[in-house]
Amino acid sequence: LKVIEIKAVYKVVFFCTFAPSKQHIMVFDLDLIQRVYQELPAKIEYARKVLGRPLTLTEKILYSHLHPESEIKNYQRGGDYVFFAPDRVAMQDATAQMALLQFMMCGRDKTAVPSTVHCDHLILAEDGAQADLQRSLEVNSEVFNFLSSVSNKYGIGFWKPGAGIIHQIVLENYAFPGAMMIGTDSHTPNAGGLGMVAIGVGGADAVDVMTGMPWELKMPKVIGVKLTGKLGGWTSSKDVILKVAGILTVKGGTGAIVEYFGPGAASLSCTGKGTICNMGAEIGATTSTFGYDEAMSRYLRATGRAEVAQLADQVRDHLTGDPECYANPADYFDQVIEIDLSTLEPHINGPYTPDLAWPISEFAAAVKEHNYPQKLEVGLIGSCTNSSYEDLDRAASVARQAKAKNLKVKSEFTVTPGSELIRFTVNRDGQLDAFEEIGGVVLANACGPCIGQWARHTDDPDRANSIITSFNRNFSKRNDGNPQTRSFVASPEIVTAMAIAGDLTFNPLKDTLTNEKGEQVRLDPPVGVELPPRGFEVEDAGFQAPAADGSSVQIKVDAESNRLQLLNPFTPITDNQLQGMRILIKAKGKCTTDHISMAGPWLQFRGHLDNIANNSFIGAINAYNDQANHVANYVKDASQATFMAVPDSGRAYKAAGISTLVFGEENYGEGSSREHAAMQPRHLGVKAVVVKSFARIHETNLKKQGLLALTFANPGDYDKIRQDDKIDILGLDTMAPGKQMFVVLHHSDGSSEQFAVNHTYNQAQIDWVKAGSALNKIRQDLGQM
């Protein structure tokens, strides 16, 4: 990339909470917040009148954010597609590249709604915060300059590398109760901790909203989780969502918003609520949220937004569900779960999936029963899920005990603050010292190991081993690229205790440890406060405001760059392209977006579609040989398979003019919101993806890129597909909402079979297919094509 020198003057804003004599305090987009709250009561009252019943909080937010193109009526949950008008958009640096490359093609001068870019994914964790950040600035300067310049041109707020993780920054600065936002990261629901409906999406969805187009979502079902009692001892908010994940599984929340309520909900801190909402992504939920309460008010005031708290207080009855919904939840929610916080145990979930939930009282036995490596090699705390002041304060109380009782960590131990505001404050208040004094290493304010941006210190990168994190996901190879790493998820305080013990079977609730003097000592339950007693403080929060007029800012992308590539529009799929197709891969078992488009070292190519396509499906397991990245190709010889890497096979078929398709099993595309997992197959010539069921975000991303996202009418038909089949898909020319299509398998023995497939396309989405992609349709509507 070669970006011309930008002459515009950047307005740097230092944001913090207290000590106003040292820092400038500001509230972002106050006019937007005032408008939302001014309009909210009338919108909710009208929706209540039309629906003729009390409303959940979820319904209040959704119905108050209907786009003008959607009439107010009783939409069928899980059935009707609805147009919405979100209040804002947030993007992280790995997904923002493709989102902004698409936005640049639309011809707008500025984004239609407030939008931000957050540089958190491209910082590799290796040596510690300062060294890692400096290295990232050097290695990724091309991408950071591009994102900064595009943000400056189009009126987008830019959070520099080191400022923090997108979801923590959003919670500290932008989230407000009753609002609706979308973000190009699957953990965007974190903002539900401040009473938002915040939904993770692909970049093409972000383009819809940034261009002022209506944003479409199937009206979600609503799952109610009633919390009673109060947390105590070693149990934390993290354990609530770990328990819920065990109940609902990784697909149990698909197509639903999870709404937490009850006296137990009111007892949780705002950031604790954020943790629960954050990991709602792991149950497939569209998002999760809590009603406005005193904890949220305290957090708004502590983060310099007293004005927002005052505005919210004036409409607080509209920022929570109607009392009737909570008094008789079975009448208003599609499913109800009840959890007593007073009896909830700490949980440890994993390995390989975040819904394998173990109460800590059962975990040691599970370790031995399943032969998980008992030695704990690394404990990692922080990430967007658990890096609040409260999280680090409680974990630091465990670390301080360890020092006082002559203990040090026996495992490698890392700490990732969620933002510079958090890092500066916990450095001032001594929590970072407490971690370092027992052997901890503080990493940069970034995603790091959570997303595979981790140069792990290990003597054997392929050895079976165990790690434990306070992160959100623990898919195979996600953290360190090693399929033999058993990754477990727990709260920061449990992770800290386990790192001190160095043993996966240690239970801090009852077990003792031998200290450096040979004494048997026990760790007491953690203690901590939800907000810093002396207030938050920061010198430079890392925010860069855009130029008031970005029209003179020019952006150039070097044609020889291997990091960035301007996009060419996808061409529409035609009926003849769906004849005689070959299988790119028939994926077996879990096939997440990490399997389809790995992160880690591949993040550097997220702005270059052709280069990132070289990682397509390299983690997926081929159903025909149980191997990863080893599939049959029939270009050279139609009757004899040549085995090669999946991307190579895709390129070979594409060069030969042969369309391909992908088959998969349940919850296909689970995990990240990365639209690359849809764009890469499209780029390689895939025309259709046929699976037993989809994860919500990925299904939408496939539709947005003009692909056919289809599901087996009979899941057993998956077993009929042979490796060397030639395949037709019938029905594109007559495709209509609710109308089945058909797959014809032409076997090499001359026989053939046909089966039905379903789809969830509405007419607008079918128009995306006919246009080649949703972006093409937007450009047509804006007169850019």
PLM feature spans:
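Extracellular/luminal Protease-associated
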Residues: F261-S267, R651, A655-F694
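Short, positively charged and aromatic/hydrophobic N-terminal segments
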Residues: E5, K11-K22
